[in-house]
């Protein structure tokens, strides 16, 4: 489903998800470098480069093409709640959303971190699920505030347009 500029949802959880995706898409449109810097700080391991890479004369096993343009595959599946009320069975069903991506991230997002015992329970089930996968799924649990903090680290004070978008998002988070 397309991310619209103005959300069309009535359920508060869906509004929060739509507004968060709009914030992230605005960051991407503003600066892909800053978007990928944000992603690297929040979800990707240090050795992962999600940016498009241009190479000349890259050798393969049987040839040397003139040039290649590549981007490592990744997928981030997001589950948003307005409390830490995540359901393990729902999160387990979300695992089937992944296919052959190199980096697979299940991002749980809420105003507060997931309760420790609940997170431990889900992550033990995830570990069993991952045993059969070549590229395991990683679970990242974070908050709206941490998401904003990471975006603010990726942009600087001169990014007035993006600062305004982030400020509006924070206003939404604290007042709606």
Predicted regions and their residues:
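Charged, terminal alpha-helix-loop-beta segments
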Residues: 1-176
